[in-house]
Amino acid sequence: LLNEIAWTRVLIMVVGGSTYAFTLILLVFLLGIGLGSIIVARRSAPRAETAATAALAQGMTGVGAALLFVFFGLLPSYIIAVFQVPAWNAASRLVLMGVAVGAVVLIPAIGMGMTFPLLTDLTARSRTARGADVGSAYALNTIGSILGAVLTGFVLVVALGTQTTLRVGLVVNGLAALALAWLAARGVAEGSTEDRRLRVRVLSAAGLGTLALVAAAAAPGWSTRLIDLGPTIYARQPMDRVARQRFLEHRGVRQLAFREGANATVSVWEGESGRSLRVNGKVDGSDRGDMDTQVMLGLAPAVARAGATSALVIGYGTGVTAHVLATVPSVQRLKVVELEPAVVQMDSFFVGVNGSVLARPGVRVVIDDARSAFQLDRERYDVIVSEPSNPWVAGVATLYTPEFFRIARARLSDDGVFCQWIQLYQLPLPIVAGIVRSLHEVFPYVHVWFGGSADLVVLASPRPITYDRMWLTQLLGPGGQLKTLTREWLSIDNADQYFGRMLLGDSGVARLISRATLEHSDNQPRLEFVAARRFLDPGADAYVVFDSLIQLGRGDAGTSPFALLRILATRRSDAGVLPYLDAAHRAQPTVFEWSVRTAGIRLALGDTAQADSLLATVTGRSSGASPDALQMRGLLAAARNRPLAGMALREALAAGADTGQLRAALALLAARGASWAEAASQARGSLSVARGTFRHPYPGEFLSQALSQIALDAPAGLADSLLGYAVGRRPGSARYRELAAVAALRAGRCEDAAASFVELLDFAVQRDNGPALVRECWTTQDSTVRIGGGSRGAAARRVQEKH
């Protein structure tokens, strides 16, 4: 089982971790074993011939297993091609993925299927006790399978990794082939009839065995960047050749950590959009894009259960949800249940958003399956949060059944609140309704809240869910310990804004449940298969489902579509919000906020003309314009390089708008005018105050353009100092590192420029002319001619031309 387990761990990283993917790998493996057994069935041959055939089978197994090292680099490209044809459905894609799995699994599986009956025949003591011999062989095979599974899954993969484990398998197959070939040749007289009959088989087996050993030692491996692509998840959008290459290289992001645990492969990546946690190639949390959902999963149940003293979280992820619950002033005891230890080991990469929650007193981590942990636990909790991965991931759907919810309810205090995360992507409304119905079967009171752009936070309780505004103010109001988190990531300043995130109350949930078509239970786990098919053949748009939920919630007490829309528009680059903003503008044409928010998204998308026309009517009323409107006016003026842009930006600053964004635009204006000291001062100020949150995002194109001009044309020392500071503030930005290399070249700091070029390789950004430019820098340093901005400046510009 060593090969089978290692193959599975590698292949699910490419074909996805759904039940169908696991079934596909197992199907091909069993097919190969069956074919191998058929090939050698009902044969009776002398022992030497049996040994020679077994040697050939083991050699074929080893060489066939080595094909994974040859073909693996091609598999992601193949999977991308499979998902680039929209007309293909789930069944077609499964068949095509089966071809890929068969290419690397079928041949060695056939060899394994041949080996067992041959070795059973070979170890038989006589022809008269076949039953006992076969029984003994099966017993040994079963013991070996158990030991192989335990040793591989819990020791070899964890300690050595799958690549080395596969190489160990090649060594075993190669040595077995050579040993059996020697056994077949032993005692056979050279030149005899038997020798002539066995020679080709024995020599072939010895050659294949030797080739397997050579492959174990010398076969090129694959990079952890390549194995961590997740092509079935993230390569669905149309791609041209350049985009495909960028995807395959993970260009622009770097891998900070990679660990193969007993249950999953876990990694941490960093790029312009922050850090993300990947489990089996799928992002399961981040320090930016998922922050609203992660915060809301902790906040919503804490608000609904005022004064909660104990909480339990299923799934650690980045630790943000646990951090929110641990920060609630009344919580004294927090338990985190996490299946994969490697996830917890990645905690240190997210201390910026999880507040080192695991180091707090009263916080405890249990490494176990959620069901097992609940059944072994005798404590009760005021709040339980279940945030597993997507239901299409194999095994996860068991955490969405009524049976599991009953287990959770048994661990909940009488007035406790259970919180369930539901992902809207790739799940149509009837399936979402089915999950909520399963919850409602166990908990009579259910409310649905908005988590993120494609996430629901569902609250359930055995008693009516009530909300204490005084408790909410204590958490989020002035001096509240969650004020900063909720303000920056949820754009909540007061209680009314919090309740704007409510989607469905009691009556809305009743209407949603009436739409349910999915029956999912432990005995009939349909969700696992339905969700996996939807994953392979996506047809449900998250915003379509979200729109249906808004319609179902109309009229519920406490729900407000316009308040919810303000929250949706917090993500300023989300084009999916535009139809809702257009509808709001038609419904409330005198509310200029909708035009301002639309303009902000249009500007983020690069559509300055449309944004400009939207703002024309708003900013014409300068005396009554909001800080956001003034900010949009200033940013648009800067984007279009208008004469009074600087004045507009400073007016917005005085009104209290986003300092980071405005100072970035001022830096660009100063750089355009070659006012380098002013440009550097504004850029440094922008970097120093930027928070990278949804409310105060990192300055984007304005700051990048300003830094680019400063790196190329500002005084070398000034540019070098500023770009070094920029990299320190944004270590995940490959663009800033490239500009830092430019500035270092101009400043004559050749070694630092070389170091920056090397660091760029971690981001899959390679400058072919980098070594030559560094050598030129060193040559210039050694010369007696002072170049200043001459040769070094030209070298720096050649870096940009390559870009």
Q: Residues of each region from the PLM?
A:
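Alpha-solenoid helical repeat scaffolds
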Residues: 562-563, 593-597, 627-632, 661-668, ...
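Alpha-helical transmembrane segments of multi-pass membrane proteins
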Residues: 1-474, 529-531
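TPR-repeat structural position
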Residues: 574, 608, 642-643, 676, ...
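SAM/dcSAM-binding transferase cores
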Residues: 469-566
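Short coil turns that delineate tetratricopeptide repeat
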Residues: 589, 623-624, 657, 691-694, ...
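Residue at a conserved register position within TPR or TPR-like alpha-solenoid repeats
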Residues: 568, 602, 637, 670, ...
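Structural motif corresponding to the intra-repeat A-B loop/turn of tetratricopeptide repeats
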Residues: 571, 605, 639-640, 673, ...
